Amino acid sequence: MASSSKASDSSSQRSKRSDQGTGREAAPASVVPIHGNLTQLIRQIKSRRLLYIKEKLEANRKTLQRHSCSLFDVAAAAEVASRGSDGGNALSQRAAEGQFRLAGSDLAHGIGERDVVYMQEENLASGTLVLSSSGAAAQRTVVRFVKLPLVERIPPYTTWIFLDKNQRMADDQSVVGRRRIYYDPVGNEALICSDSDEEIPEPEEEKHFFTEGEDQLIWRATQEHGLNREVVNVLCQFIDSTPSEIEERSEVLFEKNEKNSGSSDKIERQLSLDKTMDAVLDSFDNLFCRRCLVFDCRLHGCSQNLVFPTEKQPYSFEPDENKKPCGRQCYLRWRGGFQEIHDVGLSGCATYNMESGTVSHKVDVSIMSESEDSNREKGNIRSMTLVGTSGSKIISSVSAEESTTPPSADTSETENASSDMPPSSLRKYKISKRGPRYRERSPGKRQKVFTSDISFASNILNKLSIPEIRDTRLESREPGGDKLQILDESTKKTSSKDICGESPITTTENMGIESKKVSSTKNFLEHTLSCWSALERDLYLKGIEIFGKNSCLIARNLLSGMKTCMEVANYMYNNGAAMAKRPLLNKSISGDFAETEQDYMEQDMVARTRIYRRRGRNRKLKYTWKSAGHPTVRKRIGDGKQWYTQYNPCVCQQMCGKDCPCVENGTCCEKYCGCSKSCKNKFRGCHCAKSQCRSRQCPCFAASRECDPDVCRNCWVSCGDGSLGEPPARGDGYQCGNMKLLLKQQQRILLGRSDVAGWGAFIKNPVNKNDYLGEYTGELISHKEADKRGKIYDRANSSFLFDLNDQYVLDAYRKGDKLKFANHSSNPNCYAKVMLVAGDHRVGIYAKEHIEASEELFYDYRYGPDQAPAWARRPEGSKKDEASVSHHRAHKVAR
């Protein structure tokens, strides 16, 4: 209420000041009506506001009156009740009764006045106290003092949060530009720590909070005149706010109005399906970290730059013969039966002669067959024979329901026969609903023509099955849902002649009828393919990248509830295969399907996983230091002569040039970069044999890196029993020893009182030399931030800062692990080392020598000669003091 009146007063004063200005230019003609409308709207808002205030005051007055009357009635009733009693002050009466009861109790027990006498002069040395009482029962009590042993105070302990991995500092935790308060242990007072008054920033401008009336003003103005610069400038004259704040507020009001509009869930679902996958996954791209594989990553932050690698991870290829149907609507139930049925008697068939797109067919539905639910007596079967260009047949049998219309006595003649195609060039395929694939060819040629057979049969089968695909999901819920129909309704009207054993007869009239049927089938095919939304198509293409041409996995993982496996397979072999081709192939959707299928088969056979490559015969490669691909700057950094360089993935395509950020910073391109594997700046890992990754011969270890299972050849991790396709565990139980930080294989660390200073870290079990003990974790802060925090830590005689690289410093004061309590020593038993693990610099603590159990851990902080605390300074005359490097603050440095 007060804020609205204040805002209205400020807006009126602002408008008055603007009107009183001299030499002001005339307002444009388009601004005059906006100004007038807003002025009238402000008057209406003020009048409604005044009316609302009056009503609110009246309601509050009535409420206060009722409340006061009720309190007055309660007080009056209490006064009447007190007058009706014996009278007197109740409080004084109760006090007197209490004193009387206490005195009576003492007299009843015979206890008089007790006198306590302290015999300080006589019994001070012996440490005794004598208590005596006078009265009827005089008593004397001697109390002997017990001197307690001196117990040292517990060292100061700062509350901290455990971190299993490093994380960046929150924006509101920065101390730069703020006055820091610390407590002086000597004077026991709070002091302000600040270098100078110049560090104190200017007070920030208060953010404007919009009132309800201002929201109405902004909403009406934007709805009537739109949101442009002129409207915003006019609104600034009535609202004491900046143009950017007004624009942000208008967007908030627009979103709020959209939510309150009450759009149905069905419309929202349809709108989400019409969006592309990039639009739907906008929040996913901002929140998901592709380096840590977690949401809301605290190490790399949100809204990272998306880096799309040019080379995708290969997927495993599995032939259809080894697959199992994923459900009732799986395409393998139709495609998996490419064989000739020798044990089923055929009394009718449908023959399709294929040449230049012409089709001839013949149908008979009087064949009895087994149904999928083991009812051999029920259900009819429809079979068809597809005659190809090399003489083989395709027979597809589908059981129909018992209520199907009885077959007509007439069957159609073959509408179209190939007159100029010799019989020897015809090829026949046979498709059965079940059973392994079989070819009527010699075993030597079977594997050679596998691709073309699959593409040819799938193309024909999908065209025939298109009219029934739309209702497959509904039929699968019914008891007879697995009894699908493949043939078109036009096949019910075929003639009654059975020409299964006769020669085909062609007429011009039937050819025209059949061409219309084929054209209608093609039109329905195009309509079905167009039913795929933009989101479904994008999910399909993403499934091709992840799972390859496996419709079972695509439908199950990406299109669950939207498309069935049969629909995905049909889309794949008609339209999706051409869409999923890489841009380098540059094929159209209407291209040769067999060629498209052949290209994909070749890609599948070449792009195999690391599992398949390792099972094969390993090649003997010549190993050189250059194969590691790390620049010489890494070696200098490994010697501790300069800081490590922060790694940021590059977005280069194919090969990196001189303008690559990684090349400019002197870092290697990692697996997270967008460049290809053949990039000269790419780190290629190591090819070390057994037990060589912990020596200087390993390129990863020499460059202060940990081995990466995705990059290094022989440094891989196995887990499980191999049922999920992972590589089997090695018989000797060998595991790379340069992946301790990555796998978090740290030792057990205990926390206790240190004999040196404060708290200390102790090892629970004995360890050997160079064994990995644990990771030094904390907040990632900038060097400027570390300088400000270090001044406070120096006054508290503690140091939790650790130099990491040229951009970040680790601070374990508030967040970290137990190794933050490891003290400094000039003769340490541990050492710290910065390692590059999966593109991130991390600090590992390693044993410098053999350490027994329960022994305290020490490592050299590398203090400067003038910055080490008193307990951490070396004895006088030490030669190593001259070689130590002076730093700006007391901090820890890895070697």
From Swiss-Prot:
Its main location: nucleus. Residues 1-13 have a biased composition (Low complexity). Residues 628-732 form the CXC domain. Residues 528-578 form the SANT domain. Residues 396-422 have a biased composition (Polar residues). CDD domains: SANT, SET_EZH. It comes from the Eukaryota. Residues 427-436, 886-895 have a biased composition (Basic residues). Pfam families: preSET_CXC, SET. InterPro entries: CXC_dom, EZH1/2-like, Hist-Lys_N-MeTrfase_plant, Pre-SET_CXC, SANT/Myb, SET_dom, SET_dom_sf, Tesmin/TSO1-like_CXC. One of its GO terms (molecular function) is histone H3K27 trimethyltransferase activity. It catalyses: L-lysyl(27)-[histone H3] + 3 S-adenosyl-L-methionine = N(6),N(6),N(6)-trimethyl-L-lysyl(27)-[histone H3] + 3 S-adenosyl-L-homocysteine + 3 H(+). It is found in: Nucleus. GO terms for biological process: heterochromatin formation; methylation. Widely expressed. Residues 747-862 form the SET domain. Keywords: Methyltransferase, Nucleus, Repressor, S-adenosyl-L-methionine, Transcription, Transcription regulation, Transferase. Residues 873-885 have a biased composition (Basic and acidic residues). Residues 1-30, 396-446, 870-895 are annotated as: Disordered. Its EC number is 2.1.1.356. Polycomb group (PcG) protein. Catalytic subunit of some PcG multiprotein complex, which methylates 'Lys-27' of histone H3, leading to transcriptional repression of the affected target genes. PcG proteins are not required to initiate repression, but to maintain it during later stages of development. This is Histone-lysine N-methyltransferase EZ3. It comes from Zea mays (Maize).
